[in-house]
Curated annotation (Swiss-Prot):
pH relationship of activity: Optimum pH is 8.
Cofactor(s) in the UniProt record: FAD
Taxonomic lineage: Bacteria, Pseudomonadati, Pseudomonadota, Gammaproteobacteria, Enterobacterales
GO biological process: catabolic process
Activity modulation: Inhibited by copper, mercury and iron ions.
Enzymatic reactions: 3-hydroxybenzoate + NADH + O2 + H(+) = 2,5-dihydroxybenzoate + NAD(+) + H2O
Function per UniProt: Catalyzes the NAD- or NADP-dependent conversion of 3-hydroxybenzoate to gentisate. NAD and NADP function equally well.
Thermal dependence: Optimum temperature is 25-30 degrees Celsius.
Originating organism: Klebsiella oxytoca
Protein EC: 1.14.13.24
Keyword annotations of the record: Aromatic hydrocarbons catabolism, FAD, Flavoprotein, Monooxygenase, NAD, NADP, Oxidoreductase
Gene3D superfamilies xrefs: FAD/NAD(P)-binding domain (3.50.50.60)
Family assignment from sequence similarity: Belongs to the 3-hydroxybenzoate 6-hydroxylase family.
UniProt-recorded name of the protein: 3-hydroxybenzoate 6-hydroxylase
Pfam family name, one: FAD_binding_3
Length: 397
């Protein structure tokens, strides 16, 4: 009887839950370790492109995700200085036909629950909470992790899904994050509190000099997600804390009254100081690799953080299946296709942030270039991003 492969997954966020489910569906026995007291998500809304839905379908949870998501009519970018529309991409049937899937928005808690509920009920998945991994030891035959209470777990492979401040990554690479100087505020408001002229069934981005705002509906349009980003006056370390309305308003003094009216609506904000990492040529080794933000933390400008984690999870499961459980070959294959794609996302996201936050003549040129684009031109420009499918995930894209 063939030996059943055992995997330890560190981290129970979207990437960890998806990886647990992906590996379990390939017959791998999973132990997931989460440092928090319970497995869940913080944050507000996220956007899901067709690539994310292809991954969710591969994991067997696509229909549940669709039931919890809000399907958008379009994606729009407005100039936050003069209030004019710059970009309008239809995301209806023509978009679905072109990319093979929808564009949607969803509460982060809901998409995490969608994946975690399926993983939790899979007989091959076990988990432990309140488990802070502090040490990792690897031999030729297995890998063992130790927590801060002296407990240990041993398996054939280890997957680090423990986010931007990954302990697993630190043990492998020891590199430092790249502090961006950008701060993100997030809040959720009831639809009744949203200005009438901004109750739009779409992600709408208002691009301003050194700042931008985003809003879109959640949970059947009963709530709206608000996100504001600005260049901080200080280079801040990665972190999350409560924010202040006064700080938000101080960075958005020069924008058009229409988007500015949103800033008074939230009763509370959460504040993220952001960072990413320089792409590297290798994430792990023969028995250890990384998924999601542990591998390739990325800013929010292309709304691809969760989508990339879902792609990673599916690709890793497919690689292990194709390589018949040979971890070294599977991890090499996985990294060979995921590192170039996610590096492109990281670098493209940085550039997109610069373009969104353009000022002066650069802002004027941006608007002229983007206003003239047709729908087919927009679709061609994002084909590389949204054209990912689970059936071609082991091919370089």
């Amino acid at each position: 009887m063939a030996k059943v492969m055992r995997a330890i997954i560190v981290g129970g966020g979207i990437g960890g839950a998806a990886t647990a489910l992906s590996l379990a569906r390939q017959g791998i026995k999973v132990m997931l370790l989460e440092k928090a007291h319970e497995i869940g998500e913080i944050g507000a809304g996220i956007q899901l492109g067709p690539n994310a839905f292809s991954a969710l379908d591969s994991l067997g949870v696509g229909e549940v995700a669709r039931q919890r998501a809000v399907f958008t009519d379009h994606i729009t970018m407005m100039d936050a200085v003069n209030g004019e529309e710059v970009v309008h991409i239809e995301t209806g049937q023509a978009f679905r036909d072109h990319f093979g899937g929808p564009y949607a928005v969803i509460h982060r808690v809901d998409i995490h629950a969608t994946v975690w509920e399926a993983a939790l009920t899979h007989p091959a998945v076990e988990y432990r909470t309140s488990t802070q991994v502090v040490d990792i030891r690897q031999t030729a035959d297995d890998v063992t992790v130790f927590d801060d209470k002296g407990n240990s777990w041993t398996a054939d492979i280890l997957i680090g899904c423990d986010g931007g401040k990954s302990v697993v990554r630190q043990s492998l690479l020891g590199d430092s994050p790249r502090v961006t100087g950008h701060v993100v505020y997030r809040a959720v408001v009831d639809a009744a509190d949203m200005p009438d002229d901004l109750r739009i069934n779409a992600p709408v981005l208002w691009a301003g000099p050194h700042c931008h705002l985003v809003h879109y509906p959640l949970r059947g349009g009963k709530q709206y997600n608000l996100v504001v980003t600005f260049h901080s006056r200080q280079q801040e370390e990665w972190g999350v804390r409560d924010g202040s309305k006064e700080e938000v308003l101080s960075y958005f003094k020069g924008i058009h009254p229409r988007p500015r009216q949103m800033l008074d609506k939230p009763t509370s904000w959460r504040r993220w100081s952001t960072a990413d990492r320089e792409p590297v040529e290798k994430w792990g080794n023969d028995r250890i690799t990384l998924v999601g933000d542990a591998a390739h933390p990325v800013a929010q400008y292309m709304a691809q953080g969760a989508c990339m984690a879902l792609e990673d999870a599916v690709t890793l499961g497919k690689a292990l299946a194709q390589c018949d459980g040979d971890a070294a070959r599977a991890f090499a294959l996985y990294e060979s296709v995921r590192i170039p794609r996610t590096a492109r996302i990281v670098w493209s996201t940085r550039e997109m942030g610069r373009v969104y936050h353009a000022a002066g003549v650069e802002r004027q040129v941006r608007n002229l270039l983007w206003k003239g684009k047709t729908q087919s031109e927009f679709y061609r420009g994002i084909e590389w991003l949204y054209g990912w499918k689970e059936d071609n995930c082991l091919e370089a894209r």
